[in-house]
Amino acid sequence: MVAPSRLPSHEEQSAAAAADGSATPSQGIPVVDLGVLINGAADERSRAIRDLGRACEDWGFFMVTNHGVPEALREAIMDACKELFRLPLEEKKEYMRAKPMDPIRIGTGFYSVVDAVPCRRDYLKMFSHPEFHCPEKPAKLREIATEYATCTRALLLELTKAISESLGLAGGRLSEALNLESCFQILVGNHYPACSRPDEQAMGLSAHSDHGLLTLLFQNGVDGLQVKHDGEWLLAKPLPGSFFVIAGDQLEIVTNGRYKGVLHRAVVGGEQSRMSFVSLIGPCMDTVVEPLPEMAADGRGLEFRGIRYRDYMEMQQSNSINEKTALDIVRVMHQAG
């Protein structure tokens, strides 16, 4: 079992919360205009590709605007998710007994069987590609989630092409290496209840990196997502209508560590409950993910050993959440000197 994570000290939590509002987009969280990446003039698009590469290399995190996902669809998926969380326990319990690799799961914390640190979080997880899975109730969820999965998968695949180009590769190189035509996709709804003592903070979800390639996230207007940048925890405040994009472990592996999967966490505090909704894509489940030869040609050698994505995901999801412990297991340890 992975070693338990440490609950941040009160001082760390207070600093990270950025209650004075200093952790705003103006502090430097990169912003990527998808419209420019798809339809921009050649010189404008080249600049946007370079900026995207810097965002992946320096942050592993950015916001995307002009993404084409209707606001009405975002509101609909959030409302359907709220409705699911309000269902009687009897109508959800078959999914509450699910194991980490089951296609539909409803639960609390990260994986309550092994959680080392209590996390104030309710979640719905449903695999949506290559096969779509959805709870029967609420009845409207299936149609909404199907459309949402399709829209956000297309968005993430467009970003993947641009990220491939930012590495100096052909736009389809990452897709080819990771078999993204059969990519894995999961939708996740998160509910973080308000604290009983609004003056205190608690962990909604401890520090971790995501197991996949790219994660797309939006929230209900209540802040709480924090990212680690240059050793500091920053409160991520979104631009109106934007998505957060989070680089995951598979991007770090396939780029041989050039692009980093960012550490992030959810902090709960205040009188309002927080909700977020996530769409994550990863390689085809049976693909062995390893550094691209082009990324290991700089003399550094391989930073990671190859691992089948299904095995990596199961390892990360079945153990206590603890920063980058799963990634460290596949990291190659080089001899000094």
UniProtKB/Swiss-Prot annotation:
Its biological purpose: Involved in melatonin degradation. Catalyzes the hydroxylation of melatonin to produce 2-hydroxymelatonin.
Keyword Acetylation: no
UniProt GO molecular function: dioxygenase activity; L-ascorbic acid binding; metal ion binding
Catalytic activity from the UniProt record: melatonin + 2-oxoglutarate + O2 = 2-hydroxymelatonin + succinate + CO2
Tissue-wise expression: Expressed in shoots.
Top EC class of this enzyme: oxidoreductase
UniProt binding sites for Fe cation: 208, 210, 264
Entry note: thermal dependence: Optimum temperature is 45 degrees Celsius.
Sequence segments annotated as region (Disordered): 1-25
Compartment(s): Cytoplasm
Gene3D superfamilies given in the database record: B-lactam Antibiotic, Isopenicillin N Synthase, Chain (2.60.120.330)
Family: Belongs to the iron/ascorbate-dependent oxidoreductase family.
EC nos: 1.14.11.-
GO CC, alphabetical: cytoplasm
Keyword Secreted: no
Protein's UniProt name: 2-oxoglutarate-dependent dioxygenase 19
Residue intervals of the Fe2OG dioxygenase domain: 179-283
Cofactor-binding details, from the entry: Binds 1 Fe(2+) ion per subunit.
Residues the entry annotates as binding 2-oxoglutarate: 274
Stated pH dependence: Optimum pH is 7.4.
